[in-house]
Structure formats: structure tokens, C-alpha cells
């Protein structure tokens, strides 16, 4: 499913080992080569301990849910220098938000203010672009599909067409995710218990 990247910041990290929240995300680390989130920098909680890494690689996330990212334990956290690819991207100081969006003819479309991400692959799916002031009266915000992107540098994103007029749809909202393991943080469904209780009450009344 698609989620706004901004919703993944200050997002809880839940540990199966501890049974609750142990830290939170501070920012997403995006690889400009393939436009995907490869890791999240963490802040607060258990990562305040200098002996514990402060980055979470996306491959170590067991599940994404409304309550947060679920991991096995803090043992999966790493330091930047421990992962060559992560260290290399951090040195680029790349930030997708704030980049100008222009056409091949250098016509300015706007500025990236957010983006949507596939929660399964963490690939960037769409750019949310704020239009310039004079154009925002008609199109205050546009979304650009990644297929329209032809080039990215430190300052701008170049797209194939003048604009891709696609508004954010319901697909960018949270959808139910079916995990491949039992989620200990998910609230149990007591519907079955309520039904059993109702049957029991009716049986008692009948016997009386």
C-alpha cells in the first residue's frame, strides 16, 4: 500500500523482544539512484545508548502497521559506518523534500513537499509537488508519478512532461496489511468471545 513519507517520521519502532516501543524514526534515508528508502535514522529511547546503533535498515522491518514499525529487537540497529551503501548515501546529504521540479525545457513546476512510498518495497511511488504561488490558485498541489522522472541531481528533479495532474487518491491512505507472522501488538478481536458469552447467557435463561 502507499503511505505518505511524512507519516513515517516520528514513527514508533516496536520491539517484539521488549514488547513495546523502543525508539522513533527521525528521518528517511533515500537512495537517489533508485528512489527508494533504504533506512531510517532513529532518535530517542534505547538508541540514546551509544552502544546501540541509530539506523534501521528497511530489510530489518518485520511489519508496517498503524502502531509503528515492528522489529525483532534493537540488535538489528546499525551504525552508519557498518553498512557501506548507507554510509555512501549519507555522505551525499541527499534530501528529496525541497528539490525543485522542472521540465526538460527547465520550466519550473514546483517544489517537492512530500512523497508516497510503497510500504512493502519502500520505493518512492509519487512526488507531492507544491506549485509556485501564482499557479497555486488553479493547481495548489500536484502528484508526479516516478515514471515521469527522467533525472535527479542535488538541486532539482526533471520530469518528462509539463505536469502530471493526478490528485492524491484513497490508495495513498493506510490500508489493512496482512502480516506474515503473528503481530503481538495488534489488539485482539473479542467478537468470538462475545458471541460465546451471548450463547452462554441464553442457555442459562432457558434452563431457568
Question: How would you describe each model-predicted region?
Answer:
Residues 1-208:
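Peripheral interaction segments used for macromolecular assembly
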Amino acid at each position: 500500500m502507499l503511505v505518505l513519507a511524512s507519516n513515517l517520521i516520528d514513527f514508533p519502532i516496536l520491539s517484539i523482544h521488549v514488547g513495546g516501543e523502543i525508539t522513533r524514526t527521525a528521518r528517511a534515508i533515500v537512495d537517489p539512484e533508485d528512489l527508494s528508502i533504504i533506512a531510517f535514522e532513529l532518535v530517542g529511547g534505547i538508541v540514546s545508548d551509544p552502544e546501540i546503533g541509530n539506523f534501521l535498515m528497511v530489510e530489518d522491518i518485520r511489519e508496517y502497521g498503524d502502531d509503528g514499525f515492528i522489529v525483532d529487537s534493537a540488535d538489528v540497529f546499525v551504525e552508519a559506518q557498518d553498512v557501506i551503501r548507507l554510509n555512501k548515501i549519507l555522505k551525499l546529504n541527499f534530501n528529496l523534500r525541497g528539490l525543485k521540479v522542472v521540465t526538460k525545457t527547465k520550466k519550473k513546476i514546483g517544489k517537492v513537499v512530500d512523497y508516497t512510498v510503497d510500504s512493502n518495497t519502500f520505493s518512492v511511488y509519487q512526488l507531492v509537488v507544491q506549485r509556485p504561488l501564482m499557479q497555486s490558485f488553479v493547481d495548489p498541489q500536484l502528484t508526479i508519478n516516478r515514471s515521469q522522472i527522467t533525472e535527479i541531481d542535488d538541486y532539482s528533479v526533471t520530469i518528462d512532461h509539463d505536469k502530471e495532474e493526478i490528485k492524491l487518491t484513497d490508495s495513498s491512505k493506510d490500508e489493512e496489511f496482512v502480516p506474515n507472522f503473528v503481530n503481538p501488538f495488534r489488539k485482539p478481536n473479542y467478537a468470538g468471545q462475545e458471541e460465546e458469552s451471548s450463547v452462554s447467557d441464553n442457555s442459562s435463561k432457558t434452563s431457568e
